[in-house]
Amino acid sequence: MPLTPSSTRGIPETGAIPKHIAIIMDGNGRWARKRFLPRIAGHTQGVEAVRGTIKACIERGVSHLTIFAFSSENWRRPAEEVKLLMQLFLAALEREVTGLHENGVRFRVIGDISKFDPKIVDFVQQGEALTAGNSRLNFTVAANYGGRWDIMQAVRKMITENPDSAVTFDEPDIARHLALADAPEPDLFIRTGGECRISNFLLWQLAYTELYFTDTLWPDFDASALDEAIASYRKRERRFGRTSEQIAGQQENKNTVSNEDRV
């Protein structure tokens, strides 16, 4: 599996549109509570927001979208809510995967799905197989996922593959075993719902990601909210350890070369 460029080892290519957007979809419960509805109603409406975000990402030329659907810590929630979330996850898989495939979307799940009901695991595997050849958008769902778990499982795989690596290993040795090893590191991280933390999501991959926090509750997140996040991203100066002067000089050199090419 070819590794994508590391932001701590080199300078990834960047553009006005983020190639990879990662989202923590927070605020479903509060959205429901404000409307005197059960929490599951917020999660159900949240699925609609996911569908709209996928469409908006495709229209804007985003190539990778990763959402945090269920963390390894979410098992601590009330048992009844977890049960309803699992039912909603299964229903969404049954209803959405065919549409994703018809729209050229590659679907996959990262995380320890062995903890889920076998029926969910079966639908996940079927969906991944069905959409494996698609490339219009790479849509990844993190389920029973945690950033620390991801790093630990990568280290275990690395040592199993090469026991000597336990003593002599480098960043790429771990990186190639991470859950998103074949995807570019996220350019833009979005968290809805007003909280300002990353909650054990993609700890390795977010090293140089631009972070964007919004008070918008996830069920209310739409194309215009995505555009606001991208507009904020465009204003950022992505230095990757460099100074502003270095970036300005690099841009000046690019402009000079471009002008010379026109002559």
Swiss-Prot record:
Pfam family, one: Prenyltransf
PROSITE patterns (UniProt xref): UPP_SYNTHASE
PANTHER family membership: DEHYDRODOLICHYL DIPHOSPHATE SYNTHASE 2 (PTHR10291:SF0), DEHYDRODOLICHYL DIPHOSPHATE SYNTHASE FAMILY MEMBER (PTHR10291)
Enzyme class: transferase
The protein's name: Isoprenyl transferase
InterPro entries: UPP_synth-like (IPR001441), UPP_synth-like_CS (IPR018520), UPP_synth-like_sf (IPR036424)
Residues binding substrate: 27-31, 39, 43, 71-73, 75, 77, 191, 197-199
Active site feature: 26, 74
Keyword Magnesium: yes
Molecular-function GO terms, alphabetical: ditrans,polycis-undecaprenyl-diphosphate synthase [(2E,6E)-farnesyl-diphosphate specific] activity; magnesium ion binding
Oligomeric form and interacting partners: Homodimer.
Gene3D superfamilies found in the cross-reference section: Decaprenyl diphosphate synthase-like
Record note on cofactor: Binds 2 magnesium ions per subunit.
Family indicated by similarity: Belongs to the UPP synthase family.
Skewed-composition ranges (Polar residues): 243-263
One GO biological process term: polyprenol biosynthetic process
Role according to the record: Catalyzes the condensation of isopentenyl diphosphate (IPP) with allylic pyrophosphates generating different type of terpenoids.
Residues that bind Mg(2+): 26, 210
Cofactor(s) needed for function: Mg(2+)
Species of provenance: Nitrosomonas europaea (strain ATCC 19718 / CIP 103999 / KCTC 2705 / NBRC 14298)
The keyword Thylakoid belongs to this UniProt entry's keyword annotation: no
Region spans: Disordered: 241-263
A GO CC term assigned to this protein in UniProt: cytosol
EC number: 2.5.1.-
